[in-house]
Design a protein with these regions (language model features):
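A generic alpha-helix preference that emphasizes hydrophobic side chains
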Residues: 13, 23-24, 133
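Bacterial N-terminal signal peptides
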Residues: 8-17
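Bacterial N-terminal signal peptides that target proteins for export
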Residues: 1-8
Length: 245
């Protein structure tokens, strides 16, 4: 096995992530471990990390009153600004890529469509509720896509801002990159020849649930989405199974 493949496998299994100097875009990201041996997740209050390492929900007790207010303002502003794209056809007309991935025969699981706007993704507007990098729709067979949230992202190598303190938690993924092209998820834990393992750009999910804690969850908060009527009863009975589309 090549050294490159060994590096990929080692990073994926050892709890290591790649990090940068905040607000800088380095030529070559440094490799740093973010999990201690035996540790399964990062400490509550950690604001940046791999999606698999961050805790699902923020610990609101760690936030100040001002930070909670900032989180509520961001949530309500995003919810209001995104109302125009509740209909997926309107989102498509505005430039979001709403094309669904093909489902395998018999696949009736929840899909989470991240409808990206390529121009918004490249405009360097950060945490702009009027220009979210992606809209998130729940997709379920036999039903129209339902807008359940937005996703903000920052340019590669830039740390996402945290005006809401520990409530704002920016996640990232390990990807294989070739030159300046977009990174792709490693296939079977390996990067193809000519590409290198690095950490993708940071992202922040914001879910349109009715409570602050679940609204800032790293992954789709299925229980709360069900509670608030954003997923169908059938999908809720099926549990947390779902995938991005």
């Amino acid at each position: 096995m090549s050294k490159a493949k060994l590096l990929v496998l080692g990073l994926l299994t050892s709890g290591c992530a790649l990090g940068w100097v905040p607000a800088a875009v380095p030529a070559t990201p440094a490799v740093v471990c973010t999990l201690a041996p035996g540790q399964t997740s990062l400490a509550a209050g950690t604001r940046h990390g791999l999606a698999a390492h961050l805790q699902q929900y923020p610990d609101l007790s760690l936030a100040t009153t001002a930070q909670k207010q900032a989180a509520r303002r961001l949530l309500e502003r995003a919810r209001t600004a995104s109302e125009r794209w509740r209909n997926v056809a309107a989102a498509k007309a505005s430039g979001f890529n709403t094309q669904l991935a093909r489902r395998a025969p018999g696949d009736d699981s929840i899909g989470y469509l991240h409808a990206e706007h390529r121009r918004f993704s490249a405009d360097h507007h950060i945490l702009d509720v009027k220009r979210p990098e992606s809209l998130i729709y729940a997709t379920q067979p036999g039903h129209r896509p339902v807008l359940i949230g937005v996703m903000f992202s920052v340019p590669r190598g830039v740390r996402g801002p945290t005006p809401a303190g520990p409530i704002d938690r920016w996640h990232s993924h390990l990807v294989c990159m070739r030159g300046h092209k977009r990174g792709l998820a490693p296939v079977d834990g390996r990067c193809r020849v000519g590409s290198r393992l690095t950490q993708g750009s940071e992202m922040l999910h914001l879910w349109f649930t009715r409570d602050l804690r679940s609204a800032f969850a790293v992954h789709a908060p299925v229980a709360e989405l069900c509670r608030d009527g954003l997923l169908t009863p059938r999908a809720c009975r099926a549990g947390s199974t779902g995938h991005e589309m």
